[in-house]
Regions:
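Conserved NTPase motor "head" modules and their coupling/switch loops across ABC/AAA+ ATPases, GTPases
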Residues: 1-31, 175-186, 190-302, 311, ...
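Conserved lysine of the Walker
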Residues: 36
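Post-Walker A helix-loop "phosphate-sensing" segment adjacent to the P-loop in P-loop NTPases
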Residues: 44-56, 287-295
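Nucleotide-state sensing region of NTPase/ATPase domains
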Residues: 48-126, 130-132, 138-144, 148, ...
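Structural recognition of the conserved hydrophobic beta-strand(s) that form the central parallel beta-sheet
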Residues: 72, 331-338
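An accessory alpha-helical subdomain
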Residues: 124-214, 225
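Walker B catalytic acidic pair
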Residues: 306-308
Length: 365
């Protein structure tokens, strides 16, 4: 999938932009806070129907403006044009359209334009709680497996309903409680199976890329942990119902799953340096790119690289440059404050490129 051009109106600090894009590499240069990340977020929004950074849509509308609008035209693998549009006025719901036809459910759009974003906020994958790492799995799997989206939605609904019953002052209806527990178990076991299959395939890709970037200096591992590994999920959920009732929420289920990040045999969070942590998440995201390429009908995802070279030594920067400069990747968007990094990439790359300069929300060639 190739993003040919994009129109942006009132998206964060970008008041207006109409850009023709390179099918290979697009570089955005500018100081911090100028709008480079906001531009990448606009592209992300057209893939996922939401911002990568703001959960409340009204917060992405430019201050004192009544609406925002995004529109992108893509070349798909069949040589056809895909038009994707999103617009929202303050105080109303957003409208998301594909080829002028509005979606009934936004989840129907997920996976049409596969995309991987690598950004400084990815450090939360290591330093944050398990919900960050579950989200990582959810975002990737949802892009190629619609049944996963449905199971995740059904599981979260059942979890919410069970928790509401657990919070009641009077004894909850046991029939209702068991109904939601069964829904959690059936959908949860499906989520577990798909997450485990994803991790099994991701691990060797991730380890190979990490070794390429680090120069074989460290050994890294991923370890998926789930309550489903303790036995049938329904039994696990019901076993501690008394404790759940005491605390007022569900202590067991796939909403507590985790993906452990290890440097050698020790947690990355405790052992990794800033450079090792950044190498870890970059390798993880690039491995997800390769995984998605194999699973999304062999479609090359868009690759968004936001300020990825900060806190990396020269050897690791050079290794990443060589990686992303290869034919393995399709259309790439890279932001940096340092023109030298981008010049090195362009020297190593064959094919078309475009350089944009970003200042106070204005994007210029």
């Amino acid at each position: 999938m190739i993003l040919k051009n994009i129109s942006i109106i009132n998206f964060k600090n970008i008041k207006s932009a109409n850009l023709e894009l390179s099918p290979k590499i697009n570089c955005l240069i500018g100081h911090n806070g100028m709008g480079k990340t906001n531009f990448l977020d606009a592209i992300y929004y057209l893939s996922f129907c939401r911002s990568a950074y703001n959960s409340i849509d009204s917060q992405i509308i430019t201050h004192d403006e009544p609406f925002f609008m995004l529109e992108g035209n893509y070349d798909n693998d069949k040589g056809e044009i895909e038009n994707v549009y999103c617009g929202m006025k303050r105080g109303t719901k957003k409208h998301f359209k594909r080829n002028k036809k509005e979606y009934k459910r936004l989840s129907q759009h997920i996976g049409l334009i596969p995309l991987i974003l690598v950004s400084p906020s990815d450090v939360s994958l290591i330093e944050g709680g398990s919900e960050e790492r579950r989200k990582l799995m959810d975002v990737v799997i949802s892009q190629y497996d619609y049944s996963y989206i449905e199971a995740l939605s059904n599981y979260n609904k059942a979890l919410q309903q069970r928790n509401a019953l657990l919070k009641m002052e009077e004894e909850p209806d046991i029939t209702l409680l068991e109904l939601w527990e069964q829904q959690m178990a059936s959908n949860g076991e499906l989520l577990y199976q798909k997450r485990q299959a994803f991790v099994d395939e991701l691990v060797p890709l991730f380890q190979q890329i990490y070794q390429q970037i680090s120069g074989d200096k460290e050994q890294v591992r991923l370890h998926y942990v789930s309550h489903c590994q303790r036995g049938p999920l329904l039994d696990v959920i019901q076993r501690d119902r008394f404790k759940d009732r005491a605390v007022g929420y569900s202590l067991h289920g796939v909403h507590r799953d985790d993906l452990e990040f290890l440097l050698g045999d020790y947690p990355m969070k405790r052992e990794g340096s800033q450079g090792q942590n950044k190498t870890f998440v970059i390798a993880l995201k690039l491995a997800q790119f390769t995984f998605l390429q194999r699973t999304s009908s062999n479609t090359l995802p868009l690759l968004l690289l936001d300020d990825i070279f900060d806190k990396l030594d020269a050897q690791r920067v050079e290794a990443i440059v060589k990686l992303v400069a290869g034919d393995h990747f399709g259309q790439i968007f890279i932001t940096d404050t340092n023109r030298d990094h981008l010049d090195k990439i362009l020297l190593n790359m064959q094919g078309d490129h475009t350089i944009f300069y970003v200042e106070n929300g204005e994007i210029m060639k």
